[in-house]
Design a protein with these regions (language model features):
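Acidic beta-strand-to-loop metal/phosphate-binding motif
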Residues: 1-2, 95-108
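Domain-level signal for Mg2+-assisted phosphodiester chemistry and nucleotide/NA-binding surfaces
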Residues: 1-64, 74
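Well-ordered, non-membrane alpha-helical segments in soluble/globular domains
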Residues: 12-22, 73-87, 110-126, 213
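Acidic carboxylate-rich catalytic motifs and surrounding loops in phosphoryl-/glycosyl-chemistry enzymes
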Residues: 34-49, 137-146, 195-203
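Short helix-terminating capping/connector loops at secondary-structure junctions
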Residues: 35, 90-96, 129-133
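A glycine-rich, hydrophobic loop/mini-helix early in the fold
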Residues: 48-96
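Activity-critical C-terminal alpha-helical subdomain
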Residues: 104-189
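Charged phosphate-binding loop/patch that engages nucleotide di/tri-phosphates or the phosphate backbone
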Residues: 190-229
């Protein structure tokens, strides 16, 4: 946010690489580019979302069974809060709203096999609990740089699924971030990555080989289905 606040929209919203990716994915679905309508975006930071979740009255607080860990309860509760915010925003502006719940999942080799799926399901359950029907989990595995690395030409002629097994730890000698920097020739800022994506339109068929992206893309398509144009 350009206003140094936890919530912003319109001119105060500063897009990042994943927003640029989203713009490109939505254009063929909507028939127009959201880049031409910057006022269409509203942003809630992770800090602001957590604060709102904690401020929710006890009777509306999310409840999870004991078998659900603290981490997945976090995803569930914040998705529920975001869904309620989106529901209220749709009523306020008198228009349809899609809520994107974006988090890097930062998995490591020590993470149990189903952790990503647990987080994904927790976000879906949180949206469902809020009664918001256009909620979309966006959970890159292990993090968004893996999606960008795929688009940058990882494994030419092959698939990118192996990228999801890399460590999300930035201090790892073979981290996703360091590999992206190496592939692009140097470190790129968020603004530079946005510009790079504009110059290199998303190859959906290629990045769709990554299960975490495919799940997100399918959820996005479902959310905008029958969307009023």
């Amino acid at each position: 946010c350009n206003n140094a606040q936890g919530r912003c929209d319109g001119a105060d919203f500063k897009k990042g690489p994943m927003t640029q990716l989203l713009i490109q994915l939505l254009e063929p679905l909507l028939g127009y580019s959201l880049a031409d309508f910057p006022e269409s975006f509203a942003y809630v930071s992770e800090t602001a979302l957590c604060a709102q979740t904690k401020a929710t009255p006890a009777r509306l607080q999310p409840t999870r069974g004991k078998k659900k860990g603290v981490e997945t309860s976090y995803f569930y509760g914040n998705a529920m809060t975001l869904g309620r915010m989106a529901f209220d925003l749709a009523a306020e502006v008198g228009d349809s709203v899609v809520a994107i719940f974006f988090r890097d999942t930062d998995g490591t080799h020590s993470s149990h096999t189903g952790l990503w799926q647990d987080k994904w399901q927790s976000v879906c359950d949180g949206f469902k609990h809020s009664d918001f029907t256009r909620g979309v989990p966006m959970l890159p595995k292990p993090k968004s740089e893996a999606w960008l690395l795929c688009l940058a030409g990882f494994n030419p002629g092959g698939t990118c699924e192996a990228l999801e097994e890399l460590s999300g730890n930035d201090h790892s000698p073979n981290s996703v971030k360091s590999r992206l920097d190496a592939t692009l020739g140097r470190h790129h800022s968020a603004d530079e990555l946005c510009e790079w994506l504009i110059q290199h339109p998303v190859a959906v068929d290629r990045i769709d080989s990554m299960p975490s992206f495919r799940a997100f893309h399918e959820a996005l398509i479902s959310a905008v289905k029958n969307f009023p144009i």
